[in-house]
């Protein structure tokens, strides 16, 4: 039931986005007729809308664009479609498959005069009279309806020329009759100015924030378009919206789109531009902006970077800043009732804004525009790639799933990086000196999935730019042994990211943290690196000592900041290496700057508990001194899984040696099994050192051989004609034997005993290894309780022994 009510409320919150289906809403289709003034409908649709052949109709497209056309019937057109050619589609700013509305427009006047200008790049090199060759035949006897701002294409004299309607009398639309005067004097219009208006942002250029967009539409469009609704119900329409969220999520873009789509007057105030050195001028700048907007109502005032002009008054030292905040407050209250002025503001630091601004009646709605989820990312990628040439193998869904924590700006950068990579591949065919590039090269360009993969490897989300996250190139194969630990880790990090539905089904939140402990050199850090690489989560590595600074309160702020970043870029793995340096048992350390270390631990503890459950943030700690770590951090709910990573046994040692020598040429007679048998008590790092030394010896021998041969060649050039084989093709037994002479154990038996003891105490404190439910129905227990007993319990116990022994 809950899910049903959820979806219902979800429907209500985005109700404004739904397209209402009315008979005059039609889907745009490609036209067969090349005429610029004609659209065609099916006969049935024309009867339904009571239109006759040759009627003038008004079409409404995107971004408040309209066009006037003549309607004809076309029997091949299906009922819900409307056919129009490219020129009309451009004027309406629509694509094939978009929805437009059509309405009869019976009383279009005949024009007295119209003014049209050609667009410069289509008339280059044309001599002669434009009017005679192009315009006269186009308009002659045609009675074409035109609208101010339209662009139309005229073919004639071997080429096509585009004209723009600059002015019509009567405005805004009229029919060009035989006695209409057509002016075409003046400078041709530059294509760039035209393109700019074409590239205006609309609602369809915004992806990944559907709910927020619905909120903003009902806050902005309803009061501007239908103020009567609010009058009827008897409330004041809202007047301020504060958009906040991390940089790059599209706050300014949304404001632009709203302005374009509502057609309201748009007044942009950049925070810092208002400031002036003269007393009182900054405030009057603000007042002017608001007056200007009120004159041009309905209007939207958009204040970008609000935190620059309205910081908290008690924190600011300058008198001017305080006065500006006060001025803004009085202006927002003093907006006359229903003056149809809406104030929107954007900031990425909502908490540094003066609280008086955030009350109802000023900025009444705060819309959090957060980091998009994978469906949102897919929308954004589709928007950015709709004009790109993609090859067939590009799977945008996969790209969307792999870009955790990316905001819209990062995805745009990702697309352009992939496109650049596609161009780089063709660089050998492109010469920078040439004037033009071959059409063949141009047509063969397409962005492939490999380009996207390359771009993915280059890009990291902007939320994590400061704590630069190098995802390490370590895979599970690089880690020898430790199979159980690997499985445990995969379950911890990958399951919540990949199978969240299972956790919902069983009604549990996934566990948040793991602590690896064990002797140095056993691969604790390596494991954390591998998990960061294998599951597609972001990875932040925190070196303990970096958090502490000399300033009071700064160390704790660092901790808070890191956790905030991780939450923004969820799913994210936070890796604390050398946890013992920042999470020592509290109260014991005398003489450290005012107990800074204690405060850092307190901060970490509260952060781990206060982690909002929605975000997938995992904490992995690694330490080789588990005995001095504060016990509060080891309780379930914080770092609940304590995993002992022991010295490798013989099987693991073979695996480690093999993993180390995966890429090296090793002679057939080197017996790694024997080597593993002999190196009892060696840690993984020690084994790696043996392999490295053997490699080094082989390299040394190889270089000495080359030098010797070079000398011989110089003394006796004729004898050395025959090219010899490589004298040292692989790492031989004697290299390993030599290396073993220097091998040493880094962990003494004494240390091992300490770890075993610690693991043992943990084991004993559990003490429920042989726990069983009673078999019968004792104490009123039903049969359902007994069902869980038996093999399950003993199996559980073996697992535990395996991992922690």
UniProtKB/Swiss-Prot annotation:
Q: Which SMART domains match?
A: AAA, CDC48_2, CDC48_N
PANTHER family with a match to the protein in the record = AAA-FAMILY ATPASE (PTHR23077), TRANSITIONAL ENDOPLASMIC RETICULUM ATPASE (PTHR23077:SF69)
Question: Key word Glycosyltransferase present in the record?
Answer: no
Task: Spell out the subcellular localization from the entry.
Answer: Cytoplasm, Cytosol; Endoplasmic reticulum; Nucleus; Cytoplasm, Stress granule
Q: Does the keyword Kinase apply?
A: no
Q: By which gene is this protein encoded?
A: vcp
Main location, first listed in the record: cytoplasm
Record's compositionally biased regions (Gly residues)? 776-793
Annotated CDD domains:
RecA-like_CDC48_r1-like (cd19519), RecA-like_CDC48_r2-like (cd19528)
Q: Where does ATP 1 bind?
A: 247-253, 348, 384
Fetch the SUPFAM superfamilies from UniProt.
ADC-like (SSF50692), Cdc48 domain 2-like (SSF54585), P-loop containing nucleoside triphosphate hydrolases (SSF52540)
Documented activity regulation: ATPase activity is inhibited or reduced by lowering pH from 9.0 to 7.0, and by addition of Ca(2+), EDTA, KNO(3) or by treatment with N-ethylmaleimide (NEM).
Annotated GO molecular function terms are: ATP binding; ATP hydrolysis activity; identical protein binding; lipid binding; protein-containing complex binding
| Originating organism | Xenopus tropicalis (Western clawed frog)
Query: What's a single GO CC term here?
Result: chromatin
**Description of post-translational modifications:** Phosphorylated.
Name the domain of life this protein comes from. Eukaryota
Reactions the enzyme catalyzes: ATP + H2O = ADP + phosphate + H(+)
One biological process term from GO is:
protein ubiquitination
For the protein in the UniProt heading, the enzyme class is hydrolase
What quaternary arrangement does the UniProt entry report? Homohexamer. Forms a ring-shaped particle of 12.5 nm diameter, that displays 6-fold radial symmetry. Interacts with the FACT/DUF complex, which includes subunits ssrp1/duf87 and supt16h/duf140.
* UniProt-listed Enzyme Commission number(s): 3.6.4.6
- Descriptive protein name: Transitional endoplasmic reticulum ATPase
* Record-listed Phosphoserine modification sites: 3
Kindly list the positions annotated as binding ATP 2.
Answer: 521-526
Q: What function does this protein fulfil?
A: Necessary for the fragmentation of Golgi stacks during mitosis and for their reassembly after mitosis. Involved in the formation of the nuclear envelope, and of the transitional endoplasmic reticulum (tER). The transfer of membranes from the endoplasmic reticulum to the Golgi apparatus occurs via 50-70 nm transition vesicles which derive from part-rough, part-smooth transitional elements of the endoplasmic reticulum (tER). Vesicle budding from the tER is an ATP-dependent process.
Residues covered by region (Disordered): 768-805
């Amino acid at each position: 039931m809950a899910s049903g009510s959820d979806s219902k409320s979800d429907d209500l919150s985005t109700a404004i986005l739904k397209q209402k289906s009315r008979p005059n809403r039609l889907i745009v289709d490609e036209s067969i007729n090349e005429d610029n003034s004609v659209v065609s409908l099916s006969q049935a649709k024309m009867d339904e809308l009571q239109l006759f052949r040759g009627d003038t109709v008004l079409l409404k497209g995107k971004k408040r664009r309209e066009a006037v056309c003549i309607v004809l019937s076309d029997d091949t057109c299906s009922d819900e479609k409307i056919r129009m050619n490219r020129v009309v589609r451009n004027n309406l700013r629509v694509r094939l498959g978009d929805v437009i509305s059509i309405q009869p427009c019976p009383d279009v006047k005949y024009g007295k005069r119209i003014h049209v200008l050609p667009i410069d790049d289509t008339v280059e090199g044309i001599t002669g009279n434009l009017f005679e060759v192009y315009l006269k035949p186009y308009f002659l006897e045609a009675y074409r309806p035109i609208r101010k701002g339209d662009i139309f294409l005229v073919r004639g004299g071997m080429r096509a020329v585009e004209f723009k309607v600059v002015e019509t009398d009567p405005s805004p639309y009229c029919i060009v009759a035989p006695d209409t005067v057509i002016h075409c004097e003046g400078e041709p219009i530059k294509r760039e100015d035209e393109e700019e208006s074409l590239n205006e942002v609309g609602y369809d250029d915004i992806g990944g924030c559907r709910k927020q967009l619905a909120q903003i539409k009902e806050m902005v469009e309803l009061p501007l378009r239908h103020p009567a609704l609010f009058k009827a119900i008897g409330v004041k329409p809202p007047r301020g919206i504060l958009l906040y969220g991390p940089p790059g999520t599209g706050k300014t873009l949304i404001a632009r789109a709203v302005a374009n789509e509502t057609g309201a007057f748009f007044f942009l105030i950049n925070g810092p531009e208002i400031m002036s050195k003269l007393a009182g001028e900054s405030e009057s700048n603000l007042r002017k902006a608001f007056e200007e907007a009120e004159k041009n109502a309905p209007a939207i005032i958009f204040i970008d970077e609000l935190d620059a002009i309205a910081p908290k008054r008690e924190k600011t030292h300058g008198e001017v800043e305080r006065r500006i905040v006060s001025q803004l407050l009085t202006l927002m209250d003093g907006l006359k009732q229903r003056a149809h002025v809406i104030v929107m503001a954007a900031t990425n630091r909502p908490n540094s804004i003066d609280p008086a601004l955030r009350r109802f009646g000023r900025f009444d709605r705060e819309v959090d525009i957060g980091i998009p989820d994978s469906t949102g990312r897919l929308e954004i990628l589709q928007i950015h790639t709709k004009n790109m040439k993609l090859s067939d193998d590009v799977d945008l869904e996969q790209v969307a799933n792999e870009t955790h924590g990316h905001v819209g700006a990062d995805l745009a950068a990702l697309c352009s990086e992939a496109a650049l990579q596609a161009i780089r591949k063709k660089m050998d065919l492109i010469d920078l000196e040439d004037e033009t590039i071959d059409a063949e090269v141009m047509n063969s360009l397409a962005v492939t999935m490999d380009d996207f993969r390359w771009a993915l490897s280059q890009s990291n989300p902007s939320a994590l730019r400061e704590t630069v996250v190098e995802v390490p190139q370590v895979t599970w194969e690089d880690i020898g042994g430790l199979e159980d630990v690997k499985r445990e880790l995969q379950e911890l990090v990958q399951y919540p990211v990949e199978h969240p539905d299972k956790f919902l089904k069983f009604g549990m939140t996934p566990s948040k943290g793991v602590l690896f402990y064990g002797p140095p050199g056993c691969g604790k850090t390596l494991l954390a690196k591998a998990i960061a690489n294998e599951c597609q989560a972001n990875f932040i590595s925190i070196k303990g000592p970096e958090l502490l600074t000399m300033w009071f309160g700064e160390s704790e702020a660092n901790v808070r900041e890191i956790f905030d970043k991780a939450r923004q870029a969820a799913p994210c793995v936070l890796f604390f290496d050398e946890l013992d340096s920042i999470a020592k048992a509290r109260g014991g350390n005398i003489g450290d700057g005012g107990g800074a270390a204690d405060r850092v631990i307190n901060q970490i503890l509260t952060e781990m508990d206060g982690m909002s459950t929605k975000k997938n943030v995992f904490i992995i700690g690694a330490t080789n001194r588990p005995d001095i770590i504060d016990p509060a951090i080891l309780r379930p709910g914080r770092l609940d899984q304590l995993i002992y990573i022991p010295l490798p046994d013989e099987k693991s040692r073979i695996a480690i040696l093999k993993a180390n020598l995966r890429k090296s040429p090793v002679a057939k007679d080197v017996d790694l099994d024997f080597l593993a048998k002999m190196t009892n008590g060696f840690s993984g790092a020690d084994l790696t050192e043996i392999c490295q030394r053997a490699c080094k010896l082989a390299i040394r021998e190889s270089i000495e051989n080359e030098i010797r041969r070079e000398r011989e060649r110089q003394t006796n050039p004729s004898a050395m004609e025959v090219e010899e084989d490589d004298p040292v093709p692989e790492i031989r037994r004697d290299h390993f034997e030599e290396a073993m002479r220097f091998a040493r154990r880094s962990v003494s038996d004494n240390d091992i005993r300490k770890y075993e003891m610690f693991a043992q105490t943990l084991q004993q404190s559990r003490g429920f290894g042989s726990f069983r439910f009673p078999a019968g129905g004792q104490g009123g227990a039903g049969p359902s309780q007994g069902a869980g007993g038996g093999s399950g319990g003993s199996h559980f116990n073996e697992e535990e022994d395996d991992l922690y022994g």
